[in-house]
Amino acid sequence: MKIRVLHLGKYYPPHTGGIEIYLQQLVTHQSKGMDVTAIVANDLRRTQVEFLDGAKITRVATFGAIASMPITPTMAWHIRQSKADIVHLHTPNPGAALALLASGHPGKLIITHHADTLGRKQLRRISDPFVRAAMERASAIIVTSKRYLESSEELASFRDKCRIIPLGIDTAPFANLKTTESAYIRTEYGERLILSVGRLVPYKGFEYLIQSMKNVDGTLLLVGTGYLQRELQRCIQECSVQDKVHLLGHVDDIAPYYRASSIFVLPSITRAEAFGVVQMEAMASGIPIVNTDIPSGVPEVSVHGQTGLTVPPEDPVALAQAINLLLDNDTLRQQLGAAARKRVQDEFSAEKMVERTLKLYEEVMAESV
C-alpha cells in the first residue's frame, strides 16, 4: 500500500522561492511512488484545485496577509478531509501550523524547518505558541544543515527529534554546456560576468555586492524583484557603477545566465538565508561561488577553498577581492567550478534528498506499528 503524504506549504510554484522549489521537488519525485497531495495558500479569495507534478494541489482561498503570512481560514477544513498517513509541514508557516492543530488531523507529523520565524515581536507572541505546539507534536523535524540547527533558537528545545537532510535540486537543467542563449548574454554584457539571484530584500546583502563593484573589472547581473529595487538603483548611482551593474528583474529561464557567468555571488548578511538554493543551481552549472560566512547552511553548501570562496558578511572590500581573484585566475576558477558541480551531484541532488526523506518517513511509520 502506498504511503499517503499531505504537504502543507505556504505557496506552490509558479510562486518562486527556495521553499517552493523544495516542495515541488519533493512532490514531483514522491508522486512516482506515493499518494501525494499538497495544501497551500492561493493568491485569490477562492479555492482552486489543480493536478500538477503528479499530485493534487489545493490552493485555498486567501484573504490578505499579516507580516507576509497568508490568511487562510478554510485551510483547517481542507486538512481535516485528508486521509494522509503523514502530514509534512513546511515552516516558517504559522498559519498552516495553526490550521493543522485546529484540524485535529491524526496523521504522523513531520516538519521541515527551513528557517526561524522572522517578524515583529508582537506578532511573534501570537504565532510562536502554536508553532511550538506543532513542533512538540512532530515525530521528526528536518533541518537542512547542522550549522543552522546549532544556531536556531526555535529548535533549541527539540534537537533530539531533529534530522539533517540537506536540500536537493534537479541538476539536469543546469548541467548543459554553453548554449546559444548563454553566448548571446555574454555578447550583450561582456565576458567577465558576475551573477547574483534573489529577492531584493535586506537580508540578501545586495547593496554590499553593488558597492564591491567599484573595485571589480567585470559586469554584475542581478536577477530578482522586490521592494528594495529603487534603493538599489540609488546605490548603483551613488557608487557610479551604472555601466557595471544591471538589475534584470524577473527572468523566466535562469539556466542560460548561470552558464554565461564566470562567478556566482551570494552576499547574504543574516541567517535568514538558511541554505541558498540558487548557489546550488550555480554550482550545478559548473561555476564557482563567492558566499558569506553566516551561521546557516550557506557556507556548508559551497565550501571555502573547495568549491568557491567564503568572505565575511557586509564587507564590500572582501567581496571585491574574492571576485577579482576568481576572475583573474582561469585555472582556479575552472577547478573550483568543476568541484562545485561534482559536490552538488554527489550531495545535493533531488534524488538524494527524496531518498533520505523517504527513509525518515519509513522510520516514523514503523514507530506506529
List the predicted regions and their residue ranges:
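Short hydrophobic beta-strand element within catalytic cores of glycosyltransferases
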Residues: 288-292, 302
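Acidic donor-binding loop of glycosyltransferase active sites
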Residues: 259-274, 287
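A conserved mid-protein helix/loop that constitutes part of the nucleotide-sugar donor-binding site
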Residues: 21, 192-215, 227-233, 317-318, ...
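Donor nucleotide-sugar binding/catalytic pocket of nucleotide-sugar-dependent glycosyltransferases
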Residues: 131-179
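Conserved acidic donor-binding segment of nucleotide-sugar-dependent glycosyltransferases
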Residues: 303-305, 309-316, 325-331
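An aromatic- and histidine-rich active-site surface loop
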Residues: 73-75, 86-106, 118
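Active-site donor-binding acidic/aromatic loop of nucleotide-activated sugar
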Residues: 228-231, 242-251, 257, 309-310
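N-terminal strand-loop element at the rim of the active site
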Residues: 7-16, 21-67
